[in-house]
């Protein structure tokens, strides 16, 4: 039997890792420039965290979670998203008693039992940010500005930002009743999933991708028209702040997001140039989440970006400008008798900040030189009888084909003078 990676998962091989490292660095640098700090939470949590936090009626909880019982019969779940674990960490460690807002970012794998397709996997990776402790609309704007800034630094300027308000608990309850009244006569025309969502959270019907459901509920009341005065003012200030910072957006009445914890500001970012699966990230405000999980009444807002989708977009839009790091030096040992000296030299080069390697396959000197060419190393250092006896090293520039005999310190300074100007 051939052992393969499970369906919906994949390996990130060395030639691809450089792409990941590139976008990860841009994301980290961007978040830290906005005052966010890194947090790492467990890959699995108690199942109840997601049932309470994400919502029992969501597709994630009802269909997509990887849950299992441990040996003590406790139900655990591989994390399907990153916000609820961050809220749990905030509560568990009492971090809300310090300076607010708390601003965190995270990066790592998530897990959902979904139908694998282009840009969508069962183990996937997200970069996300969370800010707890402020309900300022200007913090909402800052979070969105950070999202846009990451895309800009990646060269993805042709984006569409979709924006909506999902109101507070007061105006949402009022709207929920009006939406139920509108949908009720057509509930038999809804898809099976929406018939189940209908009573649990009718807003989820608006998020359905089935055309039959769109047709059945057409003419539904618009949430924006039912916002309370506070939520109207909050949303207006978010819009004004985005406009003042040159961020264009589309007000999208259909945008409700797929998780139950969202309130007030909600947003998604799309890259129209990559086809039907154009959404690469999104987020919003979740002012009731911390309290729902047993903590104090602390507001929060955040977003998550799908890293596989971003990499797909960079490839499709011709924005991939990645090159695998090459060696600076390959050390060629001309005779087995000098393996120890070769190993000492290669490790001294590494300690001095030079990317270096040597052969461990017993190749001849000629074969090692040929192999060094395949590694794309800029320099070769030859270690042989003459070099060891006379205490110098032979340095060869693989581009110019020039060759010198140098003492060790002169060798290192010569190599560094070239690689530091790359």
From Swiss-Prot:
Record field: catalytic activity: tRNA(His) + L-histidine + ATP = L-histidyl-tRNA(His) + AMP + diphosphate + H(+)
Keyword Nucleotide-binding: yes
Broad class of the protein's primary localization: cytoplasm
Superkingdom of origin: Bacteria
Assigned EC number: 6.1.1.21
One BP annotation, GO: histidyl-tRNA aminoacylation
Subcellular localization, as worded in the UniProt entry: Cytoplasm
Alphabetized GO MF terms: ATP binding; catalytic activity, acting on a protein; histidine-tRNA ligase activity; transferase activity
GO CC annotation, single: cytoplasm
CDD domains attached to this UniProt entry: HisRS-like_core
UniProt enzyme class: ligase
Keywords: Aminoacyl-tRNA synthetase, ATP-binding, Cytoplasm, Ligase, Nucleotide-binding, Protein biosynthesis
One Pfam family of this chain: HGTP_anticodon
Subunit structure of this chain's protein: Homodimer.
HAMAP family referenced in this protein's UniProt entry, alphabetically: His_tRNA_synth
Annotated family: Belongs to the class-II aminoacyl-tRNA synthetase family.
Name of this protein: Histidine--tRNA ligase
Gene source species: Syntrophomonas wolfei subsp. wolfei (strain DSM 2245B / Goettingen)
Gene that produces this protein: hisS
